[in-house]
């Protein structure tokens, strides 16, 4: 931690955390800063929104959420550091799209989403109040991923919306105040300073490298590992490149209401997290596309929001970890879920370790070519639904939420599963490199993912081998 003089003012600066370094490493590799934009919209069917009050609530949100006032700059040694500004005084404008076609309005906001936020002391967010056709009104928000992740964004929306309701309606409780980002940041930096917890986590991850080398399994019938083996003349290669042309888009599939409810009911009945079911579904598909390979790895996004301070302090906390399982074909679906869940729990206990450091340790240990890896995709499951933002406050109003593509991706395909605001069903978002991955590949991935999951849910005693045979 160092003091830095900026524009005549002395500010306290802090190093980047491991979670922030993941994003900085990625954007440094592709040199497209818009990669780290997260752009979302939240709109309520309510014609009489008081935008002056809403603007005041947004300003209050900026004041209360410290990570919304983060800035980045380089210190005298050339290292990127972070610091807080005391206030956020920028204009919060209102844009009226009410006379546009709604799809054109969303296209315009998608264009905004591809304008980068620069890490040069500039603001790391942009919020615009929006009027949409059909009396839908709300917010468009673009934030930098090194300041906020999806959990933090949902918390910010919740705070602003609940504060607005508290000010405008009767019998509404004031929102709970968020925790301090700086307090959690100092704990994270203390962990990284050769703490005993860090040593325990390092020991765990180095033990994972004692296993034989993993193998890349594909997300579609096109096996890119076999293609790379042929190109390099190395039939023993087990790792593959995970990116191509980085221009990206998002394809969304909506799981119908009945199967969504069946998945949630199964999760509750057997006390298996939805994330574990999704992970098993994905690894089963990857096994299918690789000739029923038993050894499958999926990269899992771990939120690291276990404590009250972690869950309510904003910021970006996601670490990405390989979830590797070896599942025999005679294993039942339910037992396979328990294997995945146990592996997930082990990762969670040691998720604070630096993923970038572990990537380097993995590459050095197995000798895989630079830029290659063993996981064909990353899964993010967002258990907090947009419906939870307004359930107690505005139960009788329709609303919609949007996730706008920033146009860039550093992975061939990235799977995000979230809950629909209308009925709490599941939306499957496939962010994909559109010049490297075909829509046919995505369609097959979604089709077989649903097939694998619901074959298992229908009869948890079915074996993985039987499910693979039916695929």
Predicted regions and their residues:
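Acyl-thioester-dependent condensation/acyltransferase catalytic cores
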Residues: 58, 62-141, 147-151, 158, ...
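Active-site-proximal acidic secondary-structure segment that organizes catalysis
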Residues: 8-15, 19, 95, 125-183, ...
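Extended, hydrophobic beta-loop-alpha segments that form or line the acyl/peptidyl-thioester binding
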Residues: 65, 69, 154-160, 294-301, ...
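Flexible, non-catalytic linker and terminal segments flanking ANL/adenylate-forming cores
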Residues: 1-15, 19, 206, 222-224, ...
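Short amphipathic alpha-helices and their capping loops
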Residues: 1-31, 56-100, 180-248
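A short, small/polar-residue-rich loop/turn motif at beta-strand boundaries
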Residues: 2-11, 15, 47-63, 79-122, ...
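Gly/Ser/Thr-rich phosphate-binding loops and adjoining beta-strand/alpha-helix segments
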Residues: 3-16, 33-53, 119-141, 229-307, ...
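His-Asp-centered acyl/peptidyl-transfer active-site segments
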Residues: 9-10, 29-38, 66-68, 74, ...
């Amino acid at each position: 931690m160092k003091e830095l003089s900026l524009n005549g003012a002395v500010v306290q600066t802090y190093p980047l955390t491991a979670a922030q370094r993941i994003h900085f490493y990625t954007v440094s590799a592709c040199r497209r800063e818009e990669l780290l934009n997260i752009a979302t919209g939240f709109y309520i069917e309510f014609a009489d929104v008081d935008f002056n009050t809403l603007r005041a609530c947004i300003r209050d949100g900026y004041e209360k959420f410290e990570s919304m006032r983060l800035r980045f700059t380089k210190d005298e040694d050339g290292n990127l550091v972070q610091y807080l500004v005391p206030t956020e005084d920028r204009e919060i404008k209102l844009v009226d799209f009410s006379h546009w076609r709604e799809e054109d309005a969303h296209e315009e906001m998608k264009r905004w989403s591809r304008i980068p936020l620069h890490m040069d002391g500039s603001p790391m967010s942009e919020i615009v109040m929006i009027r949409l056709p059909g009396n839908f009104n709300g917010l468009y928000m673009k934030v930098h991923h090194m300041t906020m992740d999806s959990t933090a964004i949902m918390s910010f929306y919740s705070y602003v919306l609940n504060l607005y309701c508290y000010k405008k309606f009767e019998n509404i409780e004031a929102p709970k105040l968020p925790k301090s980002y700086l307090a959690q940041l100092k704990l994270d930096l203390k962990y990284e300073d050769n703490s005993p917890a860090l040593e325990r986590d390092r020991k765990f991850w180095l033990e994972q490298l004692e296993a034989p080398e993993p193998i890349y399994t594909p997300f579609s019938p096109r096996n890119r590992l076999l293609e790379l083996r042929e190109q390099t003349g190395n039939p023993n290669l087990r790792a593959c490149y995970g990116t191509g042309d980085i221009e990206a888009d998002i394809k969304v599939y909506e799981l119908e209401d009945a199967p969504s409810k069946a998945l949630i009911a199964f999760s509750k009945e057997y006390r298996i997290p939805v994330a574990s079911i999704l992970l098993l579904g994905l690894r089963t598909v990857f096994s299918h596309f690789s000739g029923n390979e038993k050894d499958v790895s999926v990269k899992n996004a771990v939120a690291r929001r276990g404590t009250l301070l972690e869950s309510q302090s904003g910021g970006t906390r996601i670490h990405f970890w390989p979830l590797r399982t070896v599942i025999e074909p005679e294993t039942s679906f339910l037992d396979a879920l328990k294997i995945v869940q146990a592996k997930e729990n082990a990762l969670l206990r040691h998720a604070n370790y630096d993923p970038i450091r572990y990537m380097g340790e993995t590459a050095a240990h197995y000798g895989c070519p630079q830029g290659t890896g063993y996981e064909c995709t990353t899964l993010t499951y967002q258990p907090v639904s947009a419906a939870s933002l307004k359930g107690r406050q505005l139960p009788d109003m329709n609303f919609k939420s949007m996730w706008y593509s920033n146009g860039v991706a550093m992975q061939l395909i990235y799977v995000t599963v979230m809950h629909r605001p209308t009925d709490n069903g599941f939306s499957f978002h496939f962010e994909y490199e559109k010049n490297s991955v075909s829509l046919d590949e995505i369609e097959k991935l979604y089709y077989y993912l649903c097939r694998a999951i619901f074959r298992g849910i229908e009869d948890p005693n079915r074996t993985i081998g039987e499910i693979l045979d039916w695929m």
